[in-house]
Each structure stands twice: as structure tokens, then as C-alpha cells.
Amino acid sequence: MHIGKYEGLGNDFAITSVREIQDSGHIFNVETVIDIAKKICNRNFGIGSDDLLILDDNNSKYEGFREFVGIKDSDCVMYLINADGSIPEMSGNGIRCFAQYANEQGYGTTDSENNITVKVATLAGLKIVIFNYMESNRCMGKVDMGPAIFEPHLIPLQSNNNVIKVNVLEKERISYVTNTGIPHWVIPLDSLDELNLDGLEQLGEALRFDERFPENTNVNFV
């Protein structure tokens, strides 16, 4: 199986295609893909990455996956699987890396100024990535992630308000929740010195799976 390794603002991604997975002898369904993602993303025994991204044509439909949004207007489809096997809707850094890989595989359109547009169907909707090429074969990739969502039922958040209280780091705090493709829980601190880096991962995991978030959430301390 041929797998590319990409990095965007510190997040790293392993990227391949449905065809590569099938040609390696696997049946493409959600259970198989989760197992493959866990193995590939493992930093000790696999390639090592934050996520596995998988490319397919815009007629993609496979067992166990949710319906993609914007698929009819897209050039291709992006499957996104976290290292732990969970399936988020979107990754801002991932979508740009994915679009670069997709263009290398022949997807997208090029205008008269050599700028490239790749339309990608995701679980969070159609995302359009534009690469503006500059000198020395460098390019700047940008994507419109759409407006942030604050309505609790759309985030989704089990609350009447996207401003919620949370007891964290021995203090009750006012925090804020939004969705920019995936849910984000923003928790203000008086100082970043409040964070114990040794226990940060454990704290983040506990908050990520808070029962108020039916689809889990990213956790951001500011």
C-alpha cells in the first residue's frame, strides 16, 4: 500500500486512497478502515500520524460510513479517521494536506494563472481548497471553513446555551462552545501557568468525552 506523509501547521497526516487499500487486499468498510488507521497512525509500530486521510472519487459510498455532504459538486471525497479510530467530521489542517495529495493524484482544476482548485466532500460539507502558486514552485493553500456554529443543537451540545460552566483545575469557569467543522470547547484560564503539562493529556481526554458532547469535542485552553 502506497501512503503519503504530510504536515500542516504541526499536525501530521498519513494519506492514501480507497483504491490503494482495496488493491492491498482489504475490503473497504468502516471496521477495516478503523483498524488500518490505528495501525498506520501508531508512532511506535506504524508510520505515525495524528490522522489517516483516505481519498476516493465523488461517487464514493461504503458500508458503515455516514453520508458525505456536497458530494455531487465535489472533485473527490475525504475520509478522515483519528489515530484512536474515531471519525470526526473535519480537520482544517488535514483538508489542505489532503487537497495537495488529491491534486497530485489528478483531482482538481487549474486556471490560466496556474492556481489550483480542489473541491472536497466531507462529513462537514463541501470544502473548496485553493492553491496560489508563487515563485520557486511554492504555493499557499487556503480553505473556506464556513461560518462558526454557535447553536447548541447543531454543534451538537446538550445544553440550552453554548456558554457553559465547567469545574476544571480546581476552579469553576465560564467556557464557550462552537463548531468550525468539528466541536471546539474553549476554556479561558487566568494564566497558562495553571496547566500542568504532565497531566494535560489526561485532562484533555476527560473533557473530550464529557457527556454533554454526544460526538465528543476538541478542547482548547486559552
Located regions from the model:
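A glycine-rich beta-to-alpha transition motif near the start of alpha/beta enzyme domains, typified by
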Residues: 1-137, 185-222
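Glycine-rich beta-alpha junction loops
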Residues: 59, 147-149, 180-184
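Membrane helix-loop-helix hairpins that form the core translocation module of multi-pass transporters
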Residues: 140-148
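Active-site glycine-rich loop that binds ribose-phosphate moieties when present
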Residues: 149-173
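Internal active-site segments that recognize and position negatively charged phosphoryl groups
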Residues: 164-196
